[in-house]
Amino acid sequence: MYIIGTDEAGYGPNFGPLVVTATLWRMAEFDFSSVITSANFAGIDIGDSKQLYHSGGSLDKLSKGVLSALASIGIFPKNDTELFDIVGKVSQLPFMFAEPEISLQKISGELKPESFNFFLSGSFHKVLSQIIFPAEYNSLLEYYGSKGELLSNITLKLVVELIADLGIDLCEQILVLCDKHGGRNCYTDILTRYFQDELIKVKEQSREISIYNLRGMEFRFIAKGESQIPIALSSMFSKYIRELLMQRFNFFWQKQIPTIKPTAGYPEDAKRFMAEIENKLKELKTDKNEIWRLK
């Protein structure tokens, strides 16, 4: 059976991108009892990215998990630019995120073959991330009307693309695991939008889990979904990509205003940061909406 896990990073901040990731696995079966809070496989931590990385801390745990997963499918990005090109769907990096290139070779060189074994045994297959910078985010927010709708649509597009890329027939068994989208419990409408010719059967809709069946597919939207490994790895990819891009964003602004303290982009600190860069933003003739997410 095929397993697709999805999750995001950057749903709440005002600065920086929203990153949504889908990972594809192929397994003989999937064990729902394999709940994890954080697990260690040959020195590689797999778990909720919010537990593996804290603002201002080391990215090492995320780096090792993400790069081990990629190494298991023969992908070895030398730097973050290559990572964005290989994994991410983004046409061009905005100028505030353009440099410096961050080398990943030191961490890649420290990985041991046994650390790949977990991903090989779990048949990790592919990863796809959508990187949405503030200007595009604001346009999509206006189009979809809410953050929850925006996230649901981006997520379903990634799922559909993964299925299409592999030519998977919907008669095959496909299990899609998603972290819940902003507390939403009902996903019938969004599934109908992307699978118009399919009959959507509601199996369960609750605060904890929402389950839907259509032909050979099952969708599970799970509260605290990072407890499932395919969702956890998607969470790690999303967070790692976002944090690498935020390092570039802070580098740009520290070149413009050497005394400014870096920001993680979340609302309270984002207000402080915006107040400090507002005049420089005018000098750069850059509209606030190009870097500030409206919600």
Pin down the residues of each PLM region:
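RNase H-like, Mg2+-dependent phosphodiesterase core
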Residues: 1-295
